[in-house]
């Protein structure tokens, strides 16, 4: 048995309506038939930009740990919808037209941590909440890091208080498994990093690897 998600355009779209649109997401309402001749059903969902997150990792001589154990760069940010300060990975929206996941990840790492990386790979791809949201999220691994000499980006609002912090990878993974880290991208990225590092980095995908992204979203609506 092959475990692989597959694209499916076989369902008949009867109607589509954009009910509301804001700067970050829109509310869409569709009517569709799951089977030919079946009664139509309605579904509402949020149309969202794609997003990226970055596991920035250092180890060996670059690590601050005595034994050279791997560390990941994390940030702590207030998230108003859940009323919580969350430990997260550097992350952001793919809201620039035509922008690749790699370019977006490079930008977010630079803007949020003043770091850049020479080596990039794809770690894991997820749909944040496929039952109600189109957001497609790619988590990338960034290594061979160096500090940006000049960063003109001004952090505002919740990002104004970002404090990038190096955390031992083992501690971060333990915190995720203990229910102390709740951000979905962070949990997925940390566990993926721990697993693939244990395999000697075998199986890492390229930064531009094929990606089963949502075909529609904030910028592109389905046509009848």
Each predicted region: which residue ranges?
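Nudix hydrolase/Nudix homology domain
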Residues: 2-7, 11, 85, 122, ...
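Active-site-adjacent beta-strand/loop module that shapes the phosphate/pyrophosphate-binding cleft
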Residues: 31-36, 129-150
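Short loop segments at secondary-structure junctions
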Residues: 35-37, 58-62, 78, 98, ...
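A short coil-to-beta-strand element that immediately follows conserved catalytic motifs
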Residues: 116-123
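Acidic, metal-coordinating catalytic segment for phosphate/diphosphate chemistry
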Residues: 14-61
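Conserved Nudix-box catalytic region and its N-terminal flanking loop in Nudix hydrolases
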Residues: 3, 46-48, 53-55, 65-107, ...
């Amino acid at each position: 048995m092959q475990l692989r998600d597959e694209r499916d355009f076989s369902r008949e779209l009867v109607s589509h309506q954009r009910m509301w649109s804001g700067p970050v997401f829109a509310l869409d309402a569709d009517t569709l038939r799951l089977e030919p001749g079946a009664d139509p059903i309605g579904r509402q969902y949020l149309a969202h930009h794609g997003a990226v997150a970055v596991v920035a990792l250092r180890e060996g001589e670059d690590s601050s740990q005595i034994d050279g154990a791997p560390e990941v760069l994390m940030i702590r940010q207030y998230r108003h919808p859940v009323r919580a300060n969350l430990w997260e990975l550097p992350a952001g929206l793919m809201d620039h037209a035509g922008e690749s996941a790699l370019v977006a990840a490079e930008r977010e790492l630079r803007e949020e941590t003043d770091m850049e990386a020479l080596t990039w790979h794809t770690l894991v791809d997820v749909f944040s909440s496929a039952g109600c949201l189109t957001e497609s999220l790619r988590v990338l691994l960034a290594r061979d890091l160096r500090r940006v000499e000049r960063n003109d980006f001004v952090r505002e609002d919740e990002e104004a208080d970002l404090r990038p912090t190096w955390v031992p990878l083992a501690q971060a993974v333990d915190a995720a498994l203990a229910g102390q880290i709740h951000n979905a991208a962070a949990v997925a990225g940390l566990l993926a990093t721990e697993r693939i590092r244990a395999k000697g980095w075998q199986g890492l995908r390229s930064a531009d690897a094929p990606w089963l992204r949502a075909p529609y979203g904030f910028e592109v609506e389905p046509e009848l």
